[in-house]
């Protein structure tokens, strides 16, 4: 479920597993422990999870320094406490209900939108992105001298959650206060404000993702994860020149979903 360290580089003759095999051997147990804690709220540290959410905005490097500390104390990089995931889910539900209210949706339309956003936009897309990043990082970014190390899928999912939270707050919460009276007014100021919020949100996602993988000492060339900034800036400039309002497109898509 998480990046692992090595005690030996290969299978010994006496049958002892190398670190990569050992990590995979225990991954199932760690996943089971994590999922089991999802239903034990008293064991979750919500205060610490809230602290992480704050610092993902103000100083995301501090969040990943804590990941290093966890590796040293618990011998794992990924979170073993699902409190962050629970708080993120609450944020997602509340902000989606707010979207339904702003777009003047009925009760059942809002519930349908909520199910779409949670299970498709968050969980489905999150699983897809995490799996892609897990594959790419293990295939192309692991240092040659560190082949006994690997990025486990669970850590890739944690990085996605970290990067998704600022994007969620910007696009699903802050943006709500500007949608009807500014962003959807079909003026230059409208799509300037809306598209700038999209630029900041997606930029945050790219940057926090980069920090997550650059925090792993056995990966190389993680700077390539910043390359999407270039096409993002080009797309932003084109959207302003062509009058393409990203938020208007999103709202139309949400309304189409719940028909």
Swiss-Prot record:
The modification Phosphoserine is found at residue 6. Residues 104-112, 185-187, 244-259 are lumenal. Residues 1-82, 134-163, 209-222 are cytoplasmic. The chain crosses the membrane at residues 83-103, 113-133, 164-184, 188-208, 223-243. Highly expressed in periodontal ligament and bone marrow, but not in gingival fibroblasts. One of its GO terms (cellular component) is nuclear inner membrane. GO terms for biological process: protein localization to cell surface. It comes from the Eukaryota. It is found in: Nucleus inner membrane; Golgi apparatus membrane. It holds the Pfam family UNC-50. One of its GO terms (molecular function) is RNA binding. Keywords: Acetylation, Golgi apparatus, Membrane, Nucleus, Phosphoprotein, RNA-binding, Transmembrane, Transmembrane helix. Its main location: nucleus. The modification N-acetylmethionine is found at residue 1. It is a multi-pass membrane protein. Involved in the cell surface expression of neuronal nicotinic receptors. Binds RNA. Belongs to the unc-50 family. This is Protein unc-50 homolog. It comes from Mus musculus. The gene is Unc50.
């Amino acid at each position: 479920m998480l990046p692992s360290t090595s005690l030996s580089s290969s299978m010994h003759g006496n049958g002892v597993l190398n670190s990569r095999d050992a990590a995979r051997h225990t991954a199932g147990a760690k996943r089971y422990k994590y999922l089991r804690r999802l239903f034990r709220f008293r064991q979750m540290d919500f205060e610490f999870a809230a602290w992480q959410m704050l610092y993902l905005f103000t100083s995301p490097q501090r969040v990943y320094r804590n990941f290093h500390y966890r590796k040293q104390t618990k011998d794992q990089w990924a979170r073993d406490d699902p409190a962050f995931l629970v708080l993120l889910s609450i944020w997602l539900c509340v902000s989606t209900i707010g979207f339904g209210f702003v777009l003047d949706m009925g009760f059942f339309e809002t519930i349908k939108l909520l199910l779409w956003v949670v299970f498709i936009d968050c969980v489905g897309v999150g699983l897809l992105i995490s799996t892609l990043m897990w594959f790419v990082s293990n295939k192309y970014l692991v240092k040659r001298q560190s082949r006994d190390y690997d990025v486990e899928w669970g850590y890739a999912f944690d990085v996605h959650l970290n990067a998704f939270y600022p994007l969620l707050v910007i696009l699903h919460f802050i943006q709500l206060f500007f949608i009807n009276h500014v962003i959807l007014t079909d003026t230059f100021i409208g799509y300037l404000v809306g598209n700038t919020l999209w630029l900041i949100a997606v930029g945050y996602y790219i940057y926090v993702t980069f920090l997550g993988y650059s925090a792993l000492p056995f990966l190389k060339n993680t700077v390539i994860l910043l390359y999407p900034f270039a096409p993002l800036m080009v797309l932003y400039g084109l959207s302003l020149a062509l009058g393409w309002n990203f938020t208007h497109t999103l709202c139309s898509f949400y309304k189409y979903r719940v028909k």
